[in-house]
C-alpha cells in the first residue's frame, strides 16, 4: 500500500464530500486530530478503520484505490 496515495486519496474524497478533517474525525468516532494525523503522515488507519473510512465515503475498498474514480 502506498502511504502517500492513501493520505492524498482521503484528502481528495474528504474535499469532494465537503467536510473538514475534524468533522470526519468525529463522524468516525475519533478525536479532532485523527484524520489530520493520517493526512499529515503521522499515522495510517488500521484495516478496520480503513473499511470505516470507505463506508463513510460510500465507496468500496476497490473504488478507494481506483485513481480514476
Each language-model region and where it sits:
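Short alpha-helical "recognition helix" segments of helix-turn-helix
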Residues: 24-25, 53
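A short, Lys/Arg-rich alpha-helix, primarily the initiator
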Residues: 1-17
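Recognition helix of helix-turn-helix/homeodomain-like DNA-binding domains
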Residues: 29-45
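Key DNA-contact positions within bacterial/archaeal DNA-binding proteins
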Residues: 22, 33, 62
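DNA major-groove recognition helix of helix-turn-helix
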Residues: 39, 49, 68
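Residues within the alpha-helical elements of helix-turn-helix
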Residues: 16, 27, 56
Amino acid at each position: 500500500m502506498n502511504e502517500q496515495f492513501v493520505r492524498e486519496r482521503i484528502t481528495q474524497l474528504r474535499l469532494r464530500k465537503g467536510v473538514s478533517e475534524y468533522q470526519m474525525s468525529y463522524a468516525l468516532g475519533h478525536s479532532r486530530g485523527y484524520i489530520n494525523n493520517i493526512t499529515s503522515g503521522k499515522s495510517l488507519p488500521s484495516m478496520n478503520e480503513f473499511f470505516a473510512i470507505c463506508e463513510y465515503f460510500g465507496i468500496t475498498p476497490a473504488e478507494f484505490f481506483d485513481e480514476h474514480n
